């Protein structure tokens, strides 16, 4: 059974700084402890979580698909249980092309800062791309759990 660790708060300045400090420890040659992504693809993959909120570049699920996401995926994403290594991911999260390390790193840090600065009030009760309305806590968990999982994957 996987241990549930205390989740960082995506809206807390100190917790955001901790994430950025971990990101700063990555280099273009940092290798994963598990999985197939290189470090630039991993950061691009993490950026998708923020793109779904801030950019209008991913089609929104509709009808039956959205219902299935809310019923079967939402709790895994916004709940406290950690992700498993090598778990399944949505198609929009699969990064097939090569990415530039510095570009993806800057995007990720910018998204982290934007999220922290917008804060809990902005997100509380806001509709998400795939899961309907979320609480501020659910938004924070969604952002921080995914990022923590992949930073841990790369040993930082």
Protein language model features and the residues they cover:
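Short, helix-capping/interhelical loops that line the mouth of catalytic, cofactor-
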Residues: 2-5, 56-103
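Short alpha-helical hairpin
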Residues: 16-21, 120-126
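N-terminal leader/capping segments at the start of a protein or of a new domain
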Residues: 22-24, 31
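Short, contiguous alpha-helical
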Residues: 29-78, 124-156
């Amino acid at each position: 059974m996987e241990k549930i660790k205390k989740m960082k708060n995506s809206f807390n300045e100190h917790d955001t700084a901790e994430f950025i400090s971990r990101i700063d420890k990555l280099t273009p040659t940092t290798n994963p402890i598990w999985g197939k992504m290189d470090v630039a693809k991993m950061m691009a993959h993490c950026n998708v979580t923020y793109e779904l909120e801030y950019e209008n570049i991913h089609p929104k699920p509709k009808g039956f698909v959205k219902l299935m996401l809310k019923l079967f995926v939402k709790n895994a994403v916004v709940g406290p249980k950690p992700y498993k290594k090598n778990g399944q991911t949505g198609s929009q999260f699969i990064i097939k092309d090569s990415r530039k390390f510095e570009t993806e790193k800057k995007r990720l840090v910018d998204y982290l800062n934007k999220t922290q600065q917008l804060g809990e009030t902005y997100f509380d009760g806001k509709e998400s791309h795939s899961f309907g309305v979320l609480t501020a806590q659910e938004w924070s968990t969604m952002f921080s759990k995914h990022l923590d999982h992949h930073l841990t994957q790369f040993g930082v």
